[in-house]
Curated annotation (Swiss-Prot):
Pfam families: Bgal_small_N, Glyco_hydro_2, Glyco_hydro_2_C, Glyco_hydro_2_N, LacZ_4. GO terms for molecular function: beta-galactosidase activity; carbohydrate binding. The keyword Hydrolase applies. It comes from Lactobacillus delbrueckii subsp. bulgaricus. Keywords: Glycosidase, Hydrolase. InterPro entries: B-gal_small/dom_5, Bact_Beta-galactosidase, Beta-gal/glucu_dom_sf, Gal_mutarotase_sf_dom, Galactose-bd-like_sf, GH-type_carb-bd, Glyco_hydro_2, Glyco_hydro_2_AS. Belongs to the glycosyl hydrolase 2 family. This is Beta-galactosidase. GO terms for biological process: lactose catabolic process. One of its GO terms (cellular component) is beta-galactosidase complex.
Length: 1007
């Protein structure tokens, strides 16, 4: 309730002035409370279906007015709504044909359209007039009833059967109203006027699609005459974390004599752990159960207990409620956070509630997929950015085991950060403005009241990117007093250190690893977390290892990658981003920052995260295993290990399951069983993998959680076999032999024909390539401008010389080129061709005269598009780059060429590192590319780099050829952020340095 409208006095008339008054943010709402579940009988509890809840989800009626001028008195019982349309609840209006979705990040949706300041709202304020008819379930007829909106964006006025019910604004926590006196048994008419904008919109400037509607469930809640209104359960550990203590605070609607209760604590098997019975004499019930024989809760071992509270009147059960709890202690001691006595490291990701088809009306299936995929990727923590999620998500995090930062629905980014990152908090809200205190504080209170019993929530966050001020200091003070069992967080104070005390954590966004290390090595007073880091936009997350290496510092307690899922909306079978809906202003593709794609398929970045976030650190060296157990509560004997031996990519040996017992935090070196391998047999890979010993809720027995390998490298070297026939003509050099013919143009300096078994494989002239289709990080770092001279340098290379030399077992064709970029010498390519049609290609880049970076160096080949399949031996199975090799392992992999194109917004993709050989083929045959004494980077795609860079969406690309890019090297992809940070120097290519590409091209004969 606001400080303007007295809570004890019911308001009977709606007032549109509330939309622009920051001191009115809820009217006639009941106090926020815990999200426990209540049932009318033991049978209902066991079935999980409550007759005390009536869903109003489904088809509603709607009138949508873009200009905010809806039908007058539409809430009246006798209003004719026959012309209203149908709409789904829960759902976002903009995805159902009412208005358009708009994506903006920092700027407000009205920026440039209207010059307004807080708490003003745009004159164009879309209004959705919702209507729902329903009959009241019989179980409700003799009970008090509340009406609950779990999520509504942004401001709602509510009427029932013509009576004004109330008003609510906080989009992401419930607005709940008592409606008993307005209800009828049949033909009830519920009306909701939902406005897209209100003063609350200044506090909801999150980086997401701006969409409105009743996007979470709407329900009726029946309340028996004995009813649990609110339940606070503080489940902690005592006796060196071996025993449990449960502090119970229950608020009971007490309207009957001779009332009593029974509280049970039951384990996951349903066995009784503890019990307490007693009379109910007041609305407050408080007691403590001590010395409970419980197992601790953690993400590794999410042991849950069910608390059941039975309410009786004269011995008859009127209501039973349940709440899952986990017993755990989360403490801040000497500037370090501990869970159950162990220093914790958050290996986390930020996560928006998002579904490519449903917007923010996400499903249980979405949540379970996210959580299971996180667990399988060694992610142990999630930040609910930047608002409280559906209650179900926290229950699932409790169950599966994820640590959670729960964050209040408060972001006012655009009120203080301006173009270019310039800070101007002149009209920042809430800041120091006490007019915004009530609304801001209510958002924290609503979140904490609802979510307080969830074991997974370790940290309360005041909000996101809203600068600082006295309001945040007051909010922080409330949080710490209301809940000393958790730690309180707010990153915004980094912009105004006057309010440093408004957070218990030193939390920063996108700080480079070296900057973080400076903090960690200078007597840190607080624990450090990177609350947003490793910006995963497009082809990104390079050098994540620089951050995970900081875990050696006790005060470094991990971070949360930005972010989990791309926010691409599906339309006509395509995933679209900002601007594609004619939404202006917009921040375009900046909504595509996910470790998983918008359709919930995994991106190649996720394998890298899994490898670096693993709690089992494996290293194979000299045939031995170095093992570090970074689990907090799990012995490494809970996993089994396999050793595997691969020769030239083929598995030749695998051990029986092995067990290595290390306590949490311990390290050890173990001898491994390996068979003898003859030196001449080829390249040998010694691999160790760690696997789950038993089924877990998120993965089956045998699932691989970590792996490492040692390579006894043995790269192939070209050895010519016989000399081809040479035809030295005026315009061309021809080389031919049994079933092959190669033609070199003396005018162009390139091979213009490559035929094996009569089939032409060269569809266009080869070209040098020094470029790649710019990644999102490249664009943000300014590489398009800085390195533009390399984009077409290869395309416009000028032939200087071509010559031919006949050798005993081969023929050499030598070419020299100049570039429109000053080089230290000639750019040369030598082709050594033998009598079997094998071509050893050596391309030498002499280095540029000018200092700077080189994106890549190699050759582009356009091959027949019919070569649709690949098979290779190298790092895989995912694309990889010099700063994102982790999570890929040497082996033989195969698939369809089109699958090499990762569905980012079109940019560099598909590179395979440390390639030994790569085959492209169809049913008729194909080509094989082989490394020649040096590592090879190679990609095979249906599109060229030029096509990719020119396209805004993958569906715009056309497949004319199969394009091969064979590279000696390519710079890393970076990922510290996507708006300025460069690729780390050790993963860049110095343009002044000479480079050489060596590979062999030969026919692939299919048996």
């Amino acid at each position: 309730m606001s400080n303007k409208l007295v809570k004890e006095k019911r308001v009977d008339q709606a007032d549109l002035a509330w939309l622009t008054d920051p001191e009115v943010y809820e009217v006639n709402t009941i106090p926020p409370h815990s999200d426990h579940e209540s049932f009318q009988s033991q049978e209902e509890l066991e079935e999980g279906k409550s007759s005390l809840v009536q869903s109003l989800d489904g088809d509603w009626l709607i009138d949508y007015a873009e200009n905010g001028q809806g039908p007058v008195n539409f809430y009246a019982e006798d209003f004719d709504d026959s012309n209203f349309k149908s709409v789904k609840v829960p759902g976002n209006l903009e995805l159902q044909g009412f208005g358009q979705p708009q994506y903006v990040n920092v700027q407000y949706p009205w920026d440039g359209s209207e010059e307004i300041f807080p708490p003003q709202i745009p004159s164009k304020n879309p209004l959705a007039s919702y209507v729902r008819y329903f009959d009241l379930d019989e179980a409700f007829w003799d009970k008090e009833v509340s009406l609950k909106f779990d999520g509504a964006a942004t401001a709602i006025y509510v009427w029932l059967n013509g009576h004004f019910v109330g008003y609510g604004e906080d989009s992401f926590t419930p607005s709940e109203f008592m409606v008993t006196k307005f209800l009828k048994k049949e033909n009830n008419r519920l009306a909701v006027a939902l406005y897209k904008y209100s003063s609350a919109s200044w506090l909801e400037d999150q980086d997401f699609w701006r969409m409105s509607g009743l996007f979470r469930s709407v329900t009726l809640q029946a309340k028996p005459r004995l009813h649990l209104e609110d339940l606070k359960l503080t489940a902690s550990l005592t006796d060196n974390y071996q025993k449990g203590k449960l502090e119970v605070e229950a608020n009971i609607a007490y309207r009957l004599p001779n009332a009593s209760f029974k509280l049970e604590v039951r384990d996951s098997e349903g066995d009784l752990v503890a019990e307490k019975l007693g009379p109910i004499r007041s609305e407050q019930l408080e007691f403590t159960l001590a010395d409970l024989p419980v197992a601790a809760w953690s993400a590794e071992k999410p042991n849950l207990y069910q608390v059941r509270l039975y309410l009786y009147q004269a011995g008859s059960l009127l209501e039973v409620s349940r709440q899952e709890v986990g017993f755990r202690n989360f403490e801040l001691k000497d500037g370090i956070m501990y869970l159950n006595g162990q220093r914790i490291v958050f290996k986390g990701a930020n996560r928006h509630e998002f579904d490519s088809k449903l917007g923010r009306a996400i499903t249980e299936e979405d949540m379970i997929w996210d959580i299971k995929t996180m667990k399988r990727s060694n992610i142990n923590a999630v930040r609910c950015s930047h608002y409280p999620n559906q209650s179900l998500f926290y229950r699932l995090c409790d169950k599966y085991g994820l640590y959670v930062i729960d964050e209040a629905n408060l972001e006012s980014h655009g009120t203080w950060e301006k173009v270019g990152g310039h800070e101007d908090p002149s009209f920042n809200v809430p800041g120091d403005d006490q007019h915004w205190l009530g609304a801001s504080l209510s958002r924290v209170k609503n979140m904490m009241a609802r979510d307080k019993n969830h074991a997974s929530i370790l940290i309360w966050s005041l909000g996101n990117e809203s600068y600082a001020g006295t309001v945040f200091a007051q909010m922080a003070d409330y949080v710490r007093k209301a809940d000393p069992t958790r730690v309180q967080h707010y990153e915004g104070v980094t912009h105004n250190r006057k309010f440093d005390d408004a957070t218990q954590i030193e939390s920063r966004m996108y700080a480079p690893a070296k900057v973080i290390e400076e903090y960690l090595t200078n007597k840190p007073a607080k624990p450090f977390i990177s609350v947003e880091y490793a910006h995963a936009m497009g082809n990104s997350v390079g050098d994540l290892a620089a951050y995970t290496a900081l875990e050696k510092y006790p005060h470094y307690q991990g971070g949360f990658i930005w972010d989990w899922i791309d926010q691409g909306l599906e339309k006509d079978g395509h995933l679209l981003y900002g601007g594609d809906f004619d939404d202006r202003p917009t921040d375009y593709e900046f909504c595509g920052n996910g470790l998983v794609f918008a359709d919930r398929t995994e991106s190649p970045k996720l394998a890298n995260v899994k490898a670096l976030y693993a709690n089992l650190k494996l290293e194979v060296k000299d045939g031995q295993l170095f093992l570090k157990n970074d689990n907090l509560f799990t012995n490494s004997s809970s996993y089994y290990f396999l050793t595997s031996l691969l020769v030239d990519g083929k598995l030749t040996y695998q051990s029986r399951p092995l067990t290595f017992g290390l306590e949490p935090g311990e390290s050890g070196t173990f001898a491994l069983p390996w068979p003898e391998v003859a030196d001449e047999k080829g390249e040998v890979v010694y691999r160790v993998t760690a696997h789950l010993k038993e089924d877990l809720p998120w993965a089956d027995e045998g699932f691989t959680v970590a792996e490492a390998e040692e390579v006894a490298q043995k790269l192939p070297e070209f050895k010519p076999e016989g000399r081809p026939d040479l035809v030295d003509s005026d315009y061309n050099l021809g080389l031919k032999g049994n079933n092959f013919q190669i033609l070199f143009s003396k005018v162009k300096g390139w091979p213009v024909s490559l035929k094996y078994a009569g089939r032409e494989y060269l569809k266009r002239l080869p070209e040098f390539t020094f470029w790649r289709a710019l990644t999102d990080n490249d664009r943000g770092a300014g590489y398009g401008y800085d390195l533009a001279r390399w984009e077409n340098a290869g395309k416009y290379a000028r032939l200087k010389d071509i010559s031919c030399e006949v050798k005993e077992d081969s023929v050499l064709v030598k070419t020299a080129f100049t570039l429109p970029v000053a080089l230290k010498g000639d750019l040369t390519v030598t082709y050594e061709v033998d009598g079997r049609g094998k071509i050893a290609v050596t391309a030498d880049f002499p280095g540029a005269e000018e200092a700077g970076l080189l994106p890549a160096f190699g050759l582009n080949l356009a091959l027949p598009k019919e070569l649709t399949d690949y098979r290779y031996y190298g790092l895989g199975p995912n694309e990889s780059y010099p700063d994102r090799l982790e999570g890929n392992y040497l082996g033989i992999y195969q698939g369809a060429v089109k699958k090499n194109f990762s569905p980012y917004r079109p940019q560099e993709t598909g590179n395979r590192s440390k390639v030994r050989w790569y085959q492209l083929f169809d049913e008729k045959g194909g080509l094989e590319f082989t490394a020649n004494g040096a590592d090879l980077n190679l990609s095979a795609l249906p599109y060229s780099a030029a096509q990719i860079e020119a396209a805004d969406h993958a569906f715009e690309l056309t497949n004319n050829y199969t394009w091969v890019r064979a590279l000696s090297a390519q710079m890393g992809v970076g990922g510290d952020d996507s708006w300025g940070q460069k690729v780390h120097p050790e993963f860049c290519l110095d343009a002044q340095k000479a480079r050489q590409l060596r590979l062999v091209i030969q026919p692939l004969l299919l048996k």
